[in-house]
Amino acid sequence: MATPHHSRRGSMAYYPRVRAKRIQGDIRSWPEIEGQTKVQAFAGYKVGMTHIQMVDYRKNSVTAGQVIMAPVTVVEVPPLTVMSIRYYARGDNGLEVISEEWAENIDKDVLRRINKINRHKKGIEVKDVDDVRLMVHTNPQLVSGVPSKTPEIFEIRIGGSTIENRIKYAKERLGSNISFSDFSKPGNFVDVIAVTKGKGFQGVVKRFGVKLLPRKNRKHRRMIGTLGPWHPDWVRNTVPQAGQVGFHQRTIHNIRIIKFDTKDHVDDINVKGGFLNYGIVRNDYVLLFGSVPGPAKRLIKMRDPARQTRPAVESIEVTYVSRESKQGD
């Protein structure tokens, strides 16, 4: 009998490996924060990647204080519009909506998503409210790289301080726009929630990374050696099989914000010939360290970190941003 020499191929941590329900990621949990009242998430459109040179801010690094090169992802973050406020109370089945408060003027493009707006406002008392969230929508018409005019609608939790301050914060912003600076700043960490690139129906080698069978194997090499033993007489879910690859929702924890700038300085980031499959940036933008899930043009969401292990830094000095063409010339 052959001697086992390798652990199982592929992780069982992400099951079932099926397509995400929606093309935008869903924020399923919110960390508790202390300090000033603020929104705990934001959304933007993935533009592409480039590289920068910056002063190494890590005190214990061998290159501390020196100029190093780093890969970054460019995310265009136009303002989000607050269309309503939702008040939650904790019930037997978790948080339940007890009242909503809508803005007076709603963008006509929002009606592409919502058929009817119920403006009936139910009176509430502060003592009955356990959580306050903003219902916001994106403004894709501001983004030249995204052809859609239909806005995406989602909730953003308001955190920090007391419930009274959160309600006041929400009412001050009802019907107006919020920017990325209301959410976070360079040097802080965020969790990125997005849907990955879709790869379609793929075999076991690409999907799980199983080993190719020997060259003289009958019929095929890119297959598994066996579906399992005679008994139990069913195929177990641990056996690698062909199926969907990609288009899964994933959360990447603790991604550092390297830089944030307004639309007045987009010339500092736009590359020659425009970003591949996107074009040029026209709105506020943010640089995130490393890569994030999804292709260009996809909406990604950024949330306050749920498992921050390293401290934030006050500022990051960026000395150079590559604006060379990404067209492969």
From Swiss-Prot:
BP term (GO), one: translation
InterPro entries: L3_arc_euk, Ribosomal_L3_dom_3_arc_sf, Ribosomal_uL3, Ribosomal_uL3_arc, Transl_B-barrel_sf
GO cellular component: cytosolic large ribosomal subunit
Gene Ontology terms, MF aspect: rRNA binding; structural constituent of ribosome
Annotated keywords: Ribonucleoprotein, Ribosomal protein, RNA-binding, rRNA-binding
SS bond partners: none
Stored Pfam families: Ribosomal_L3
Source organism, top-level taxon: Archaea
Subunit structure, interactors included: Part of the 50S ribosomal subunit. Forms a cluster with proteins L14 and L24e.
NCBIfam families: L3_arch, PRK04231.1
Recorded family membership: Belongs to the universal ribosomal protein uL3 family.
HAMAP family in the cross-refs: Ribosomal_uL3_A
UniProt function note: One of the primary rRNA binding proteins, it binds directly near the 3'-end of the 23S rRNA, where it nucleates assembly of the 50S subunit.
Name under which the protein is recorded: Large ribosomal subunit protein uL3
Organism: Picrophilus torridus (strain ATCC 700027 / DSM 9790 / JCM 10055 / NBRC 100828 / KAW 2/3)
Gene that specifies this protein: rpl3
